[in-house]
Swiss-Prot record:
It is found in: Nucleus. GO terms for biological process: cell differentiation; negative regulation of G1/S transition of mitotic cell cycle; regulation of transcription by RNA polymerase II. Residues 730-860 are annotated as: Domain B. Residues 873-889 have a biased composition (Polar residues). This is Retinoblastoma-related protein.
Length: 1011
């Protein structure tokens, strides 16, 4: 096969500008700075310096930024420069309250861009120009830029605004007293009533003055519900869309009337104590900002307060009367203007108008999730639909005398609130100290480790949840300090994480002791790294439940001193031993494991390389050349000092010094147990087995499992399970097995989108296995999707298929895990012997990577896969099998494509033309609307919180067997057998793969790349 047969033939033409146009771009940016943004001289000078320093990067990467004209790309780059300068210069000079602050919204409006496009492209700028920003603003520029936090904030605000709009429209009529003054009709899509507008502005005031700058989703939702309570009390009753005596809407009642706060908590799954606290803060804001006089609602006789138990409620006489409403809105607007001008933040008022062009209509999370429905943008690269704790079915108002069951809309906000309810009801009541049973396990070790465990938990969780402010704003006057609120919030979350940690640890110990018939678990419980991983998991679940913005994953890794590879060892064990864990949190952990496998475990500084260098000594030179090894895990004392945590005078852990001096990648073990680790049930079914043994374990679920201790032991230590492997070899085989499984899922999904035959799928899968085994270094510091995409194109070329890289990328963009930087920025470290004369490190597009790195390394493997290679193999003698490119000794054997969950339709019965099929990702969006979802029964998903799905299935069966006659006849001829038969391929085991000759003759679906 010639080089031409594997090189790229459909390279995207690079967009370039005339050589003298750099000066014109600089002049246009100067004009924007002066005439449109009115920047001061210092900021404008810094902007021009950054633009000049990075101009060569812009000109060299025009084709990798945006997707439009050179003018559009220039606007992108100008926006990046201006945003970085305005944010970083303030951070450097501490001018947080300077006048005429430049907000991101103002920059985007001037440059005619939207938020979604900006955040989709700015990672490219940061990656390409990162070294320039480091030189100008210091190594901490990325942390000070707060891009991830701001993006998460935008997604949360988008979700909250829709949540608020839906709740408002359910409670109040769309028109109000001043609607006649609006140019937009009350029933128009873009119409927002004054009362609606007032509520959102009051919520923003609450966010600014009572919450920290980046607050979690659950706290913000509590704030919105408190605003709804205030609106119910103050909006004139004639604009209500409900009756206060409606027992279905306001279910909580007392002898004095409706308990408004308790009813709203019941409806929106909020904490009553928390809601009352937030309402008090909102009332204080009304007093301090709007200068309204509060009075006890029990002393007021107003129509709005009829049938409501007013004990403990505050009422403001003229808060939302027509004569004062407009002035109140203007005061809140002015107050918000002052706030954002001093902080340079986003103008969050735009979210009250769903049609604001600044929001855009793209996706902030990759895949097909749009800005208007970014339900899981911050939690997972994979899409999810619901949670077992999704809001239950709630009765609607009776229609024609018959009660109708109405599905409560399932949104990320409602899901977060019901998940928080699990934390509140199941975890919070637990003790914050080890139980008597857990203390027994601690004291049964070779020495009592109780002090070690509790000290470690206090330090690690104290680092993750510091009692200092998460934000940086603090207000004066009668308003409460944000720092104090943050300290209370952090302490609450710390206690929740500690309770969860002790609960799961106790369950693990109990399961282990049953297997061992004893309570001495020294080997496991004395392992520092194991406990840190458990603490990180517990903290991450608490953070994920509250949807925090400031502590998004992987922040817990940095705080605990572990790596992504470490955490991947305990995720499944953690899920397995917390049976009440809501499905939404299980999905979150699964998505984290996917992120760890696809890229994070391959990054520089991953402890995976410390094991790999032992398991595959031939890779040591490349690992050292790239500087990939992990640093020693920081001691608890170092973490305590760094985070200013008091250790309470407790002595340091006795085994810390030993770990750092002799066992950087594992935990210390008791000398008495150094060679006697036991078998453990704390691991998933196949995660700690060699890939070649997978089939055996699949068929025999009772097989003995290797110990979890070995996963955290020194890489050079012999595996107690035997087989002559070191712990490093066992761990790497497990890790590689997971990588192969993840790759198989993504290969099949992309094959389906590309409509490629089964043979291509198997060849790509085989090639990935060979690369992982024989060309492992290709994965170093890269994303596995980069290798998968190149493998697709390479296999297409040797198969002589008319498949272009554009088509591959076009369809990859539709994958839920897609991120543009995967194919735009591939890490390359040119060796000193590089044929192109380049040296050092850089990030290139995937086309350059394919031609310059991938093909030179993988070409021999591709040749073997092709028809010529297969024919040559059949003629070769046994002695020829051990050539340079054959499988290396000790590497996993190549396996056929695994039996993944079948996505093909299957016929239910030979007598009926009825087919059932697992839900495809392309159909998920349709289920997200309540009206559509009511037509589906999702197996494994409960319709009520804390209810077993089996009860739902029983109810469905009872309804089906009730004997009720259907007046019409179902038409089963809509889908013919012949249509479905085509999709019942080899995946179902019902047909053999098509011959190679026919495969190569299949037409390849061609589509134009998206813009």
């Amino acid at each position: 096969m010639s080089q031409a047969s594997v090189d790229m033939e459909d390279v995207k033409p690079s967009i370039s500008l005339p050589s003298d146009d750099g000066g014109a771009m600089e002049a246009r940016l100067t004009d924007v700075c002066k005439s449109k943004l009115a920047l001061d001289e210092s900021t404008m000078r810094q902007a021009m310096i950054l633009f000049r320093e990075s101009k060569h990067i812009l000109l060299a990467n025009m084709s990798a930024i945006g997707s439009g004209s050179p003018e559009e790309i220039e606007r992108f780059w100008s926006a990046f420069v201006l945003y970085c300068v305005t944010r970083l210069s303030k951070g450097r000079t501490k001018q947080e309250k300077e006048e005429n602050g430049i907000t991101l919204c103002r920059i985007l409006r001037v440059l005619k861009m939207n938020v979604v496009d900006f955040f989709k492209e700015i990672p490219q700028f940061c990656l390409k120009a990162g070294y320039i920003l480091t030189g100008l603003y210091g190594s901490d520029w990325e942390k000070r830029l707060e891009l991830k936090e701001l993006q998460a904030n935008i997604v949360h605000l988008s979700l909250l605004s829709r949540y608020y709009k839906r709740a408002y429209q359910e409670l109040f009529l769309p028109n109000d007293a001043s609607s006649g003054r609006h140019s937009v009709a009350p029933n128009s899509v873009g119409y927002v009533s004054d009362y609606h507008h007032f509520g959102w502005l009051l919520f923003l005031a609450l966010r600014i003055h009572a919450f920290s700058r980046f607050k979690d989703l659950v706290t913000c939702t509590n704030g919105l519900v408190s605003i709804l309570a205030i609106l119910i009390l103050h909006i004139p009753a004639r604009f209500r869309n409900f009756h206060i005596q409606d027992s279905l809407l306001f279910a909580k009642r007392t002898a004095k009337g409706v308990d408004l706060v308790a009813s709203l908590c019941d409806k929106y799954h909020t904490s009553e104590d928390e809601l009352r606290r937030v309402m008090e803060k909102a009332n204080n804001l009304i007093v301090d900002i709007l200068k309204k006089k509060p009075c006890a609602a029990s002393e007021c006789k107003r129509e709005n307060l009829a049938y409501i138990n007013t004990d403990g409620l505050i009422y403001f006489e003229d808060l939302l009367e027509e004569n004062s409403l407009q002035s109140s809105i203007l005061i809140l607007e002015d107050n918000y203007d002052d706030a954002i001008n001093s902080k340079g933040e986003l103008d969050e008022r735009m979210f009250v108008n769903d049609e604001d062009s600044l929001l855009g209509s793209g996706s902030l999370s990759g895949g097909s999730i749009k800005m208007k429905r970014k339900y899981d943008a911050m939690a997972s690269p994979a899409k999810s639909i619901t949670s077992p704790l999704s809001p239950p079915l709630s009765p609607a108002s009776p229609v024609n005398g018959n009660p109708v069951i109405k599905m409560v809309p399932i949104t990320p906000v409602s899901t977060a609130m019901t998940t928080a309810k699990w934390l509140r009801n199941i975890i919070s009541p637990l003790p914050s100290r080890p139980s008597t049973e857990l203390l027994c396990f601690f004291s049964s070790c070779d020495r009592d480790i109780t002090t070690d465990v509790t000290r470690r938990a206090s330090i690690i969780l104290g680092a993750i949840f510091p009692t200092t402010s998460f934000g940086d704003c603090c207000i004066s006057g009668n308003l409460q300090s944000v720092n104090q609120m943050d300290s209370i919030w952090a302490e609450q979350r710390k206690v929740e994480a500690m309770k969860l940690y002790y609960r799961v640890l106790e369950t693990m110990c109990r399961a282990e002791s049953h297997i061992l018939n004893g309570n001495n678990l020294t080997s496991l419980l004395s392992n520092d790294r194991f406990h840190r991983c458990m603490l990180a998991c517990s903290a991450e679940l608490v953070l994920a439940t509250h949807k925090t913005v400031t502590m998004m994953f992987p922040a817990v890794l940095e705080k605990t001193g572990i790596t992504a590879f470490d955490l991947s060892k305990v995720i499944e064990s953690f899920v397995r031993h917390e049976e009440t864990l809501p499905r939404e949190l299980k999905r979150h952990l699964n998505s984290l494991e996917e992120r760890l496998l696809e890229s994070m475990a391959w990054e520089r500084g991953s402890s995976m390389y410390n094991s790999l260098i032992v398991a595959r000594p031939t890779l040591a030179a490349e690992i050292n050349r790239l500087g990939l090894l992990a640093e020693p895990m920081p001691s608890l004392d170092a973490i305590a000092v760094h985070n200013n945590i008091s250790t309470g005078g407790l002595p340091p852990l006795p085994f810390q010094k030993h770990e750092h001096s002799s066992d950087q990648n594992g935990g210390a073990v008791s000398p008495k147990r150094a060679c006697s680790e036991y078998r453990s049930v704390l691991v998933e079914r196949n995660s700690f087995t060699s890939p070649v043994k997978e089939l055996t374990l699949t068929l025999n679920l009772k097989s003995k499992l290797p110990p979890l201790q070995s996963a955290f032991a020194s890489p050079t230590r012999p595996n107690p399970a035997g087989g002559g492997e070191t712990c490093a070899e066992t761990g790497i085989n497990i890790f590689f097995n997971k990588i192969v499984k993840l790759a198989a899922i993504r290969i099949r999904s992309l094959c389906e989108r590309l409509q490629l035959p089964q043979q291509i799928l198997e060849w790509v899968y085989c090639l990935i296995q060979q690369i992982l085994s024989q060309r492992t270094a290709l994965f170093f510091n890269r994303h596995i999707d980069q290798i998968i995409l190149c493998s697709f194109y390479g296999v297409a070329k040797i198969s002589q298929m008319a498949l272009t890289f554009k088509e591959i990328i076009y369809n990859y963009r539709k994958q839920p895990q897609c991120k543009p930087q995967v194919f735009r920025s591939v890490f390359v470290h040119w060796p000193s012997t590089s044929h192109n004369g380049k040296t050092g490190q850089e990030h290139v597009d995937i086309i350059t990577f394919y031609n310059e790195v991938f093909i030179p390394s993988v070409k021999p493997l591709l040749v073997e896969l092709g028809p010529a290679g297969v024919a040559q193999k059949s003629k070769s003698s046994p002695e020829d099998s051990n050539n340079a490119d054959s499988q290396i000794p000790g590497s996993p054997r190549l396996s056929p494509f695994p039996n993944l969950p079948d996505m093909s339709p299957k016929k239910v019965s030979a007598a009926h033309n009825v087919y059932v099929s697992p839900l495809r990702s392309s159909k998920m969006d349709a289920l997200l609307s309540p009206s559509s979802k009511s037509y589906y029964a999702c197996v494994g998903e409960s319709t009520h919180a804390y209810q077993s799905p089996s009860k739902d299935l029983t109810a469905i069966n009872n309804r089906l067997n009730s004997g009720r006659k259907v007046s019409g006849r179902l038409n089963f001829d809509v889908v013919s057998d012949s249509v479905v038969a085509g999709s019942l391929g080899a995946q179902n085991g019902s047909s053999a793969p098509a011959p190679a000759c026919s495969i190569l003759e299949l037409p390849v679906k061609r589509e134009q790349p998206d813009s």
